[in-house]
Structures are given as structure tokens and as C-alpha cells.
Amino acid sequence: MLEVIGTDAGGLAGLVPPSLALVRAAELLVAPARLLAELEPWWRAEQAAGRISAGSPCPQLLASDRPELIFGAVEQALAAGRPAVLLASGDPLWFGIGRLLLQRFPAAQLRFHPAPCSLQLAFARLGRPWQDASWISLHGRDPEPLAAALQKRPSALAVLTDPSR
């Protein structure tokens, strides 16, 4: 089973206890590079606090920034029955890596643990309901649809971006 765990803006510090238990038990841990940077120091701190046994090695760490490069390692872990965790931002099934995983792996091999997404948190900060907002994702996508979305003059338009946009 691949446990796909959403994180909020707090990263590892924002995970709930059941998700932390899955991370501690993982033999393969896949995450964006920004979260991977936190993992080794976090692992050592968990060992120092006695939440992970002192002799327990840090799991295999793999960056998910280019998802096509993780599939082989995930397939091997699943075939061998090794505990595997993939950390993602927010809700992995909302404009996230979850769609790609479902295209590649049977749903029975995936379990999703969503966290609030960035736009959900933004609307909460604004004190605005978000069910009537229009959404567009430019994350790794062509920005051309943004112009068409803006021409429709929605009352609220939320735009997901990535570091290059």
C-alpha cells in the first residue's frame, strides 16, 4: 500500500499523529525536494526523542518533483510489501499527484490522506466561501487558459501556480 499523505504549509510539523506514524514506519519515503530537506533532521530528532528506535535507519528518500522518476521505486516497494509513503501538498487528489498515481497504480494500492489545500486555506484567511469560485491550475501547465478564464469575469478566480509561473 502506498500511503499518500497531504501536508499543509507546516510540512512535517503539521502532520496529524496517524500520518506521523505512517512516516515513521516507511521504508520508502517520496516527497517534493522542499520536504525532503526536512526529513533527515526530523528523523534524527524523532530518534533523539525516542519516537523512532535509535538503530532504525532513515528510509530511502526519493524526490517527487519529477513524478515519472518515482514510479519504478514505488512499484518495487509495493511488489516487495515495503511500507511506502508519498508526501504531497494539500489534497493530493485536487490538482495534485494523486491523479497521476491513479493513472499508474490500481486504486486498491493507494490510500489518500488529504490536508487542506493552499487555495482552501487562502479562502479561509479571506473569510470567503469557496464553493462558487472558479479554479484554474497553471502548475506545470500552459498559461494560455488563464486569459480565457479572466474574460469570463468570475466573481472569484483562484489560480494555482508553480515556481516558474
Which residue stretches match the model-derived regions?
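Class I S-adenosyl-L-methionine
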Residues: 1-113, 120-121, 141-143, 156
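Conserved beta-strand segments of the P-loop GTPase G domain that flank and frequently precede/overlap
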Residues: 5-6, 136, 160
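Active-site-proximal loop->helix
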Residues: 124-128, 148-150
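Short, structured loop/turn "capping" segments at alpha-beta junctions
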Residues: 129-134
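A short, charged helix-loop
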Residues: 135-148
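Conserved anion/nucleotide-ligand pocket segment
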Residues: 145-165
